[in-house]
Amino acid sequence: MKINIRYAKLEDAVAMVAIKNRLSFKNINGTTTTGGFLLGTTLQTYQEYIANDYCLVAENEYQIIGFGIILKNTTLQQSDIWTKRHAANWEIDITKYESPNVCYFEQLAFLRGYTRVVIRLCYQLLQLAFNTHDNLFTTTVSSPILNLAAIPFIEKAGGRKIGSINEVYPEVGLILSDIYLIEKHIYIKRLEQSGLQPLLNRIPYELQIF
């Protein structure tokens, strides 16, 4: 098995939508929901992410098996996420983090059976993001579905839960999400402890083969 991790191209957006639509999530009542992220993402949205933000894809024999997206500060500040930050239930003083050096982990989606690849792609994404950003925020949905895909990596990278937010969307109703923060200086310490730093420094981002 030959796995490549590379920058996403505009033409990859079609495969990304297909992966999103194959994802399944466990509802808190024990049932399973299929069809991708709760609120969905359009082909055009993925193309915009690819053009403007940090977006990596993983391939197995040239077939895309997963992807990750981090929004740069410019995109974040123009998003609904940024507008809604004052509606969140914070466990920290959020004003200390409202700076140009904040980015946001938007999506992580993989087909089943590629756990190790997920972690490696996430490390690559954070390496890119922390070249120009000091703090990374992300949210994970806790109700009405459980989206736990990113939590193992968040914990490995030194992330911590720092709040929650309740949102109401006409198409789905009430959504509850936990908010996490990964700070660059803590991430660097965790990376050094993991022993992966030399590997990430040595291999170009354009192509990761393992």
Where are these regions (language model features)?
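Conserved GNAT acetyl-CoA-binding A-motif
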Residues: 103-105, 129-144
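Conserved beta-strand-loop-alpha-helix junction that forms the acyl-donor binding cleft
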Residues: 108-112, 138-151
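Conserved catalytic-core motifs of GNAT/GCN5-like acyltransferases
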Residues: 140-142, 160-174
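Conserved GNAT-fold acetyl-CoA-binding loop/helix
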Residues: 24-44
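A short beta-loop-alpha structural element at the N-terminal edge
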Residues: 3-18
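A short helix-loop-beta-strand connector motif used in the catalytic cores of GNAT acetyltransferases and
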Residues: 44-57, 73-80
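Conserved acyl-donor/pantetheine-binding loop and adjacent beta-alpha core of acyl/acetyltransferases
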Residues: 69-107, 113
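Conserved acetyl-CoA-binding loop-helix of GNAT-fold acetyltransferases
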Residues: 107-130
